[in-house]
């Protein structure tokens, strides 16, 4: 890429063996800039919150975590699985310094949609340094432990975790807000020292 930039050649078209043909060099330069950033694995002050919910309890928790993280001045991408599919989540993960994952416990396990996304993300081998887990449950509550295992297998340092039996009360909501702030502060410190 450096050779392209310094060659002095006037490039009018880029036609790779695989992928789109570029005739607009302004658009190609934007894509090239993104590719350089992504291949260098530079991370931003960004947190991706991935969650799914059955009866809205986990979503309530996610919203309070989001509020806490945003109050600390970092970028937050909310990725509820009822609105985003896994490739869209993977795109947001490229430059994220933290991932916070939440799901309800279902049949002594995590919600199936989260297992799918986490398996997919694990295979992409992102270098996300920090994470946290949260979730709601009614009986057994194994979800957080399993979410934690997924993230740890990806090399993510778990900053904190919260679980709520049934609908989160005010105490749990405050804990979620603080979790968001805590992860955001870890991210800011990481980027500062990067």
What are these regions (language model features)?
Residues 81-87:
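Short acidic loop-to-helix transition motifs that present clustered carboxylates
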Residues 1-75, 82:
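Accessory terminal helices/loops
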Residues 1-21, 64-77, 89-194:
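FMN-binding flavodoxin-like domain, especially the glycine-rich phosphate-binding loop
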């Amino acid at each position: 890429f450096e050779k392209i930039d310094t060659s002095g050649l006037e490039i009018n078209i880029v036609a790779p063996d695989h992928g789109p043909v570029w005739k607009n060099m302004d658009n190609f330069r934007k894509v090239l800039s993104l590719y350089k950033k992504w291949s260098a694995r530079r991370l931003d002050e960004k947190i991706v919150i991935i969650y799914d919910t059955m009866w809205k309890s986990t979503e309530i928790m996610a919203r309070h975590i989001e509020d806490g993280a945003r109050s600390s001045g970092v970028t937050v991408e909310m990725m509820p699985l009822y609105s985003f599919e896994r490739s869209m989540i993977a795109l947001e993960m490229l430059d994220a310094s933290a991932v916070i994952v939440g799901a309800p416990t279902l049949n002594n396990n995590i919600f199936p949609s989260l297992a799918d996304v986490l398996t997919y993300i694990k295979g992409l081998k992102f270098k996300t340094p920090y994470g946290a887990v949260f979730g709601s449950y009614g009986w057994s509550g194994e979800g957080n432990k399993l979410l934690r295992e997924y993230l740890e297998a990806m090399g993510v340092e778990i900053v904190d975790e919260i679980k709520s039996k049934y609908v989160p009360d005010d105490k749990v909501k405050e804990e979620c807000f603080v979790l968001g702030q805590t992860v955001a502060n870890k991210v800011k410190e990481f980027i500062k020292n990067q």
